[in-house]
Amino acid sequence: KCPDISSGRLNPTNSEYVIKNLDFGIDACMKSKDLGLVTGPISKENIVEGGYSFSGHTERIMEKTNSDDVLMLLASERLKVALATTHMPLNKVSESVTTDLIINKVKILNQELKSKFNIEKPKISLLGLNPHAGEGGKLGKEEIEIIIPAVKELIASNVDVSMPLSADTAFNKNLLDETDAYFAMYHDQGLPVLKALSFGDSINITLGVPIVRTSVDHGVALDIAGKGIANNRSEEHTSE
């Protein structure tokens, strides 16, 4: 039986339906390499209220495909931004950013830029965690103790990645033109810039998993549901 649907209103009883359809799509793609998964926006809050432990599509795909690691990449024609951490409270980010995490995820990004985007020698601009990238340890020690050791190991592995950059100036035009992808430490560090430049024209791509998955760059937008004013450009780009 189809769950009750009211335009513009969340219903936690729909959570099971949403999760089952997502899992069905993941399983189908695992069985056939000719298939890809395109997902629409869902309310994480609504899924959790429906009784599921759920932090996002990306994390669910990682779990269902038994992948060791996964990387969220938002991409448009102008800009690509990958995330070290995804959907977590800001006060958890610092403890979650480790040297191994950075190494693993930047290696995924480097490899997938080559294989999926045909970039022979990707140039990655990596953002620091703290304001001014820690300013020599005066505004935080994470750059010195965690991030720079990761970058040094990546460079030794022939990955073209920058030392941690101050996020407030890293998206200047000159660097933007020279960068194939940015690596941000948390969700709201890199994505506001991408969405300011390309909102509605960018897509979400899951890297590091054995299936192709793309998604729109926006949320459920309940405030405009049923009004006929939604912009579907991002949805069109997900299938290109």
Regions found by a protein language model. Give the residues of each.
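Short, basic/glycine-rich phosphate-binding loops at helix/coil junctions
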Residues: 1-7, 81-89
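Active-site glycine-rich loop that binds ribose-phosphate moieties when present
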Residues: 60-68, 88-114
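Short beta-strand elements at the ligand-binding edges of bilobed clamshell
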Residues: 73, 81, 88-97, 229
